[in-house]
Amino acid sequence: MRAERDRHTTAVAALLAAAGLLLGGCSSAASTTASTPGSASSDTVGSTAAQGPAAGGGPSSAAAAASASGTPAGDARPGVTALEPLPAAVPTALAPYYGQKLSWQPCDDGFECTTFKVPLDYAHPEGGDLVLSAVRAPALPADPGSGPGSAGAGRLGSLLLNPGGPGGSAVEYVEAAASSFDSGVRARYDLVGLDPRGVGRSSPVTCLNGERMDAYTAVDITPDDQAEIDALVAADKEFAEGCRRQAGDRLGHLGTVEAARDMDVLRALVGDERLNYVGKSYGTFLGATYAGLFPSRTGRIVLDGAMDPSLDSLGGNRTQAGGFETAWAAFAKDCAKREDCPLGRTEQQAGEQLTALFQAVDARPLPTADSGRRLTEAQATTGVIQAMYADFLWPRLRTALADAKAGDGTGLLKLSDSYYDRGADGSYPNLMFANMAVNCLDLPAPFGGPADVQRAVPDFEQSSPRFGRDMAWMALTCSYWPVRATGSAHTVRAAGAAPIVVVGTTRDPATPYAWAQALAGQLESGRLLTYDGDGHTAYGRRDACVDGAVNRYLLGGDAPENGKRCGA
């Protein structure tokens, strides 16, 4: 939706929703008490979107990197080229960054924190630096009774984690989720979280204060007349201008390619020859980008809840709308079987009653228990979408919908607030601001203005009768972004890389299963692991088949056979 890619510590919530924010300028995050690695286990969970010759040694954007290859890779769409690797040798101009010494200091109740520098612009490293923050959970003593290959085995180095977004804090994610990782993985890896540039503790981008964000999340995203269109455009312009004013030059250097290059600097600084990595949602796009740029430095890579980098922003947003429709159908089918379902006794009735509820809230926003705030249609839609990220939120959604039909919008507003990780004091974290900044830089805007959106709405509604119109208008923000996109759609082959495990969930709302199939097919060494189930992402959600396959790979390098299926 509007800025999402996961914590009852702001970490896991913002991280899991962030793990799946909406493409049009959003990905998603969630508020949870993580009980398993990288999975949603609390109130919120998260969509994403992704993405010249450099003195620093190669392209500083996906577009520049892809331009090196004039031939589409594999079954790429017309005009979509391959992301080409950077030179294997570290350029002289970047040697000082790769030669830094990390100073890990105790922090945050049992963790270790550090900072290091990267160039603002890899094409011109002399032009100034950014300071990035990382945290690690040092490897624990092996438990002889733990999982595959753990007891007595040697250390494997660092395992870099990213929860998604873009905009999810990997620092917060590691601190929230480290204790839930497999004991064998914890015994052989330091778990490391790097907040990407512009995110969390790494030179974070901010755009609006809490009061203005409340207004932004409430604005009508299904405008019925010119006045409502003008109000939506004004809100998008205010958001974009706030980012420009407060971020300055950084706004043009927050792309995924640059973030992947930052990860390579950290890989070298922790002393690893190859990067080992688990990325979720948008984190899969970041990890795939790393593999494409540095295939010879790619170690054991797990991409869970995968994005398809060959999609442009229009195609990505439209297919993502279809993903949420699929998730809604699963919810509606389940709801219709339950006594407390407030939407009727058939899937068709559930859809009709949800549409009627949205229309009623659009005409007359509902009162809530939150200091005079009223629930708007935009927030009602966001609340429903939030619950599609994980089926453990479905009971809460049933209650919220029943309350809304009775005239109380409190439950849906709380779900909407958890999507954005809004604090009880009315403040918002950096998540949504970074989400928009990265998405609008990685891909050209899908629309030039409101007229383009209006023309596209029928196609979006065909993909998603429930959410298509909303998600088309949500994608308008990047049309007013003050910085031109530097990236473009591309395939990622990562020729010569070790096996890369791509995990897809069949009814994933934020990253549709077809995206995982596409990414696994693009990667020369891709191995598709399928989880037949609901919710966003699969690893760490207590499916023994998925968790066992991923843990065996991380611990012993034994990648699952391509096409392996788990779940129902």
Predicted regions: what they are:
Residues 22-25:
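C-terminal motif of bacterial Sec signal peptides marking the signal peptidase cleavage site
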Residues 532-538:
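Histidine-bearing beta->alpha loop at or near hydrolase active sites
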